[in-house]
Amino acid sequence: VFIEPRYITKNIAWKDKKKVLVSKASPGGDEYPHSIISTPLYADVNTVCTETYLIVDFVNNKIEGQNLISYMTTRFFRFMMSLIKNTQNISKGVFAFVPIQDYSKSWTDEELYAKYGLTKEEIAFIESMIRPMK
C-alpha cells in the first residue's frame, strides 16, 4: 500500500533504511515445542510499518538482512528470546539475552551450538522446547 510521506508521523528517517521486521504478536499457544516468533521479513528502503511489526535491526544490504533472518530462525536465537518472553507480545526487551552475530554470513544451529560450547544435553533441551522454523 502506498502512503504519502507527509502521513508518516514518527521515525520518518527509518523509511530510507533497510530493515528486518517481525510481527509483534507471536503464533502458537502453550503446547511444546514453541515457535516463539512469526516468520521475519526483510523490508527494503521506502518501506514503513505500523505497530503491528517490530523492527529487529537495520542492515546495510539485503544479504545482511537474509543472514539476520537465518539467525532469527535458529532454535538457539528463539530459545534465548524465550528466556524473557512470557506473553505472545514481542517487545524489544525480549532480545536482551540474544547475542549479536556477524551478519555477513548466514547462521545455523549447529554453528551456534559449537560457537557457544553447548553440551549435548543443553542442545537436546533447546530442541525439545523450540520447534524448527521452515
Language model features with spans:
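Polybasic, glycine- and aromatic-enriched phosphate-binding surface used to engage nucleic acids
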Residues: 1-106, 111-117, 122-134
